């Protein structure tokens, strides 16, 4: 019995460390200078109007989010965390299209809100997949509330520090989760593909104008949408194809 208790305590240590990192990183935010929204953020490279749609490519390139979100909701909508995840992806398509139709801080709120919910849902789902469904269920609602509050705080104070945490903390936490906890399901490669595609999306976003200047065909921001939606598709494929990973008898005994 003592050995089993010690084993369970050992398994919980990485999760406790992750929660500690979460609290510590949040506690450091007030020590950082406020981050205001850059007014030039809305000046995207490709502002062409086509078929009566302003900023055409930045608007219509959100369609893949809607498609991935629709399939995800259809197949996995009965699971709470995955429902939030794919609803967030689905609504990101509409929120981002709404924003790019008329880019300003007011419409940007509706672009960022579903994205913030998606970031926190991805973190929750990863905890469910690598740690336990119970741990994920405990984290889901507090993290979603934090996501919503981060956007409200930005609107009230023009301070993006907390929203920045919501967006980038999963980038730190997910690798730690995947290293600290063994896979309970197959398909880890899909998570790696999703991470690579998201990194590519951020790169496209940064080089928006530079990419558009080469031929004036598509801008970096449009390509960012395609890459980010592809990352969401990789996560969808993970859930479509994953299978439980068999564990050795000794490990199975240790986990009970």
Task: Report residues per predicted region.
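Active-site rim beta-loop-alpha module in soluble metabolic enzymes
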Residues: 152-185
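Short, highly charged, low-complexity non-transmembrane loops/tails of multi-pass membrane proteins
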Residues: 246-256
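Early transmembrane hairpin module of multi-pass membrane proteins
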Residues: 2-139, 149-152, 156-159, 185-247
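Core segments of transmembrane alpha-helices
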Residues: 62-70, 144, 167-174
